[in-house]
Design a protein with these regions (language model features):
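Bacterial N-terminal signal peptides
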Residues: 10-21
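Short, solvent-exposed loop/linker segments at beta-strand-coil boundaries, enriched for Pro/Gly
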Residues: 60, 68-85
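Aromatic sugar-binding surface patches on proteins
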Residues: 89-96
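Short acidic/polar inter-strand loop motif in beta-rich domains
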Residues: 114-121
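C-terminal edge beta-strand
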Residues: 122-132
Length: 134
């Protein structure tokens, strides 16, 4: 009897361990949103990471900047600009933000693409997503 139960218990424990590491069940799962998904509503759970990736052109002065506050629902964890392709003036870049869902509620992230010295009134593009955090 013990020889039969041991493999089953081992299989059950390994299955539980794998499921606990699954990003679908993990509280800190990362949800990535791109420019194409702008305007959508996104559902998050407290602890989830929201990663926003927006394309730009290096050397032009244009940046994606956050327009609307999202506190206390999200916490900004990081913001970075990554080079895409060959490093040349004007070559594509990707601006990437990582936010952590901090508490339940609803908020919206709005961003505008403009040169900071010209102001948001001269924005050439906009991005936004509505968030529902459970």
């Amino acid at each position: 009897m013990g020889k039969i139960l041991l493999p089953r218990i081992t299989w059950l424990l390994l299955t539980c361990l794998m499921l606990s590491q699954s990003p679908l069940l993990a509280a800190d799962a990362t949800i990535t949103v791109t420019k194409e998904q702008g305007g959508r509503e996104i559902a998050l759970k407290v602890g989830n990471i929201l990663r926003i990736e927006l394309p730009g052109k290096g050397g032009t002065g244009y940046l994606w900047l956050v327009e609307e506050t999202f506190a206390p629902y999200l916490k900004l964890m990081s913001e970075a600009t990554q080079k895409v392709g060959e490093p040349r003036p004007g070559s594509p870049v990707m601006q990437v933000w990582r936010f952590k869902a901090a508490q339940p509620g609803a908020c919206e992230i709005k961003m505008a693409f403009y040169r900071p010295w010209e102001g948001v009134g001269k924005a050439v593009d906009h991005f936004g997503v509505k968030l529902h955090i459970e």
